[in-house]
Amino acid sequence: MLDGIHKIHLIGIGGSGMRAIANILIQKGYDVSGSDIAESAVISKFRDMGATVHIGHNKEYVNGVDAIVRSTAIREDNPEIVAAKEQGITILHRSDIVKAVLDVTDGIAVAGAHGKTSTTSMIGQILVEANADPTVIIGGEVDYLKGSSCLGKGHFSVVEADESDGSFLKLHPHTIVITNIEDDHMDHYKTMDNLLNAFCEFVETLPEAGKAIVCGDNENIRYVMSRVKRTFITYGLEDN
């Protein structure tokens, strides 16, 4: 999945977005280490699975690793980021791992201001109960996974796409689901036009045969539909 990389260190490994990634990487057989600011049940679980997890942040934790995985929340002055740059270690964003999963599967990516986690979870459970053995990456804990992700052997994957920092534009799924678009994450996008343009770009990542399943009740989604030439399947409660 990640050519030439074996030892991977995740900063903030216990966070809601990172824990799903860590679980996938451990199950894929990578030599995983990580760091976080406090002990937790999920950190204990990762240790039981064979990962090395440190409490606190220290430049020594990245010695000998092939790559660092971070989220946008990790500051540039984090000592592990600083050390990785000094040593020329590859620094990946968590979205790069999500992309790597999508690139080798028939990927379904779910985005939107509200309902991403629930929708991703429901699609994942449908595939699990249909014995499709999917790979699932969610931003929250769900009962049927006993966590927030699972590594399947089937050809489907379903992931929660994070539009908050624009990193969802790295993804190239075969199917996109958009629950709604609202004036959210303005700290990153600054204007509603920028947010809408990002969603247009996201839909344009679909291959020609790809489909976008969207809530047709949402005015902003209808705007995206008017801008992008892709196949849309709409759902909603309104008569139109």
Describe the residue ranges of each PLM region.
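A short, basic/flexible loop-to-alpha-helix module at the beginning of a structural domain
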Residues: 1-5, 58, 98-100
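ATP-dependent carboxylate-amine ligase
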Residues: 1-52, 64, 68, 86-89, ...
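Phosphate-binding loop of NTP-binding sites
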Residues: 24-30, 47, 61, 72-231
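Residues in the short beta-alpha loop(s) of Rossmann-like NAD(P)-binding domains
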Residues: 36-38, 140, 217-218, 238
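Short acidic-hydrophobic, aromatic-tinged amphipathic segments that line or gate anion-handling sites
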Residues: 53-56, 92
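Short, conserved beta-strand segments within well-ordered enzyme catalytic domains
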Residues: 54, 69, 213
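Short, glycine-/polar-rich solvent-exposed loops and beta-turns at beta-strand/coil boundaries
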Residues: 61-62, 240
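Short, intrinsically disordered, charge-balanced linker/junction segments flanking boundaries
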Residues: 130, 233-240
